[in-house]
Amino acid sequence: MSISQSDASLAAVPAVDQFDPSSGASGGYDTPLGITNPPIDELLDRVSSKYALVIYAAKRARQINDYYNQLGEGILEYVGPLVEPGLQEKPLSIALREIHADLLEHTEGE
């Protein structure tokens, strides 16, 4: 059986070590960002339900997005991020970090 040139180039790629959860080692993996950082359990402590958290974060993310869109027009109707945004960080991630840091006041039902 002969190996084609494209298959040979694939065969030449060294294998990547697989993560073994039984080893107890966590090396090689970065701390996840976004919905898992801040932890969802800590976010749920700040609202009455997971549904309230979704609405709360979505409203704030929309405000942040509108703020960025209006910067070029010179209209500053919305408040920008209250935490230092990371490079290419999404508005929802920023909103969740603001909620986690207790930087916002929210009344449910509004």
Swiss-Prot record:
E.C. designation(s): 2.7.7.6
Stored Gene3D superfamilies: 3.90.940.10
Assembly information from the UniProt record: The RNAP catalytic core consists of 2 alpha, 1 beta, 1 beta' and 1 omega subunit. When a sigma factor is associated with the core the holoenzyme is formed, which can initiate transcription.
Enzyme class label: transferase
Family note: Belongs to the RNA polymerase subunit omega family.
Protein name, per record: DNA-directed RNA polymerase subunit omega
Top-rank taxon: Bacteria
Gene: rpoZ
